[in-house]
């Protein structure tokens, strides 16, 4: 018989065997202590395996696969749709692809813009007509600054006469009156999605429709693996003051060729044939400026760009911190992280801050837009 007090065995094993045999009296003198020793070692290994496996998995996830924002591959799809192309074969053969992907990309750019909308809002009104329209509807920026309420006026195209208005103050006011409602309306849609997101996250159990909605939003914001923290950072508004400042800078307060001919408010590039070639482009450059059917499409593409592109990741992190600290967004701080938007870098961000301050654009950051007659009708 093997001596269980053999000093060659580990001390704690000898103590365990001695205690187990003496206290329980379930092993007779004829029982092979060698087998008992093997059983104990195997049991210890099994217990260690199931204890260490979860800890090892968490370590690998934390160290080897940190929670990074996934680069937005949907921006490439967006450009393809804008160019009128079908999604490429690699996307179509992807097992995660379904037939609604192309419709989703198009829908996310143009939203609820239908052919009927294009016919109505796509008409270019003269500046004199717009002045009268705003007067008849009591829509003035002075009232907006005081009452913090904007009228749901949707203008599809900028008037050609903008560049002919000699009074700089009047030209700027007309431009803001046109652009502000479009920005507020797009932000409203994002806020509704954000409200729904947090409502779903506060539920104990999600319904099938909740999960379908989440999957749609993950795809819309270019996120894989159901990364909720990234979705919360990306699904947020663009401060109106920042958006107006960028639109003003990119279009010369609505007087540029890109804005008047292509309804492009934010100078986003495309490398397709369907775009406007910059007159001052360097030799050998192939980029063009995106064209849109109506202004609201340009606004939607702009918010999508800032909320998904990796170049503005730092801006989204700072925005999330502002949300956590006080809830209100500070456009002056956020603008500092738009240096990748233009080739001039930090010089570009300083110009934006100057535009915001000189024109008191922060007054519009807490403005609400009245619901349109169509929205009211849907509530009845």
Where would I find each of the regions flagged by the language model?
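Catalytic cores of secreted/periplasmic lytic hydrolases that degrade extracellular macromolecules
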Residues: 2-245, 249-380
């Amino acid at each position: 018989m093997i001596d269980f007090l053999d000093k060659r065995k580990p001390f704690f094993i000898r103590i365990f065997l001695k205690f187990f045999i003496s206290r329980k009296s379930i092993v007779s003198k004829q029982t092979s202590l060698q087998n008992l020793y093997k059983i104990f070692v195997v049991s210890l290994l099994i217990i260690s395996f199931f204890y260490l496996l979860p800890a090892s998995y968490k370590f690998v996830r934390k160290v080897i696969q940190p929670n990074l924002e996934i680069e937005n591959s949907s921006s490439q799809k967006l450009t393809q749709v804008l160019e009128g192309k079908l999604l490429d074969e690699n996307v179509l053969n992807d097992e995660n692809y379904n037939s609604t992907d192309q419709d989703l990309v198009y829908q996310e750019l143009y939203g609820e813009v239908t052919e009927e909308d294009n016919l109505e809002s796509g008409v270019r009104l003269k500046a004199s007509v717009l002045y009268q329209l705003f007067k008849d509807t009591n829509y003035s920026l002075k009232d907006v600054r005081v009452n913090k309420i904007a009228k749901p006026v949707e203008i599809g195209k900028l008037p050609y006469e903008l560049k002919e208005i000699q009074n700089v103050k009047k030209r700027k006011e007309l431009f803001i009156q046109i652009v502000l409602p479009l920005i507020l309306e797009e932000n409203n849609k994002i806020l509704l999605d954000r409200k729904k997101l947090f409502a779903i996250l506060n539920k104990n159990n999600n319904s099938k429709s909740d999960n379908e909605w989440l999957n749609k939003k993950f795809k819309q914001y270019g996120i894989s693996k159901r990364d909720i923290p990234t979705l919360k950072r990306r699904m947020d508004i663009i401060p109106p003051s920042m958006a107006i400042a960028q639109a003003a800078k990119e279009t010369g307060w609505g007087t540029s060729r890109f804005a008047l001919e292509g309804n492009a408010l934010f100078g986003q590039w495309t490398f397709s044939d369907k775009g406007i070639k910059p007159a001052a482009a360097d030799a050998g450059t192939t980029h063009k400026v995106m064209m849109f059917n109506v202004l609201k499409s340009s606004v939607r593409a702009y918010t999508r760009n800032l909320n998904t592109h990796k170049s503005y990741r730092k801006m989204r992190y700072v925005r999330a911190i502002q949300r956590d600290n006080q809830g209100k967004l500070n456009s002056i701080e956020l603008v500092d992280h738009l240096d990748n938007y233009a080739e001039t870098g930090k010089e570009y961000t300083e110009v934006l801050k100057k535009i915001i301050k000189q024109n008191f654009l922060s007054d519009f950051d807490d403005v609400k837009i009245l619901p349109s007659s169509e929205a009211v009708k849907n509530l009845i």
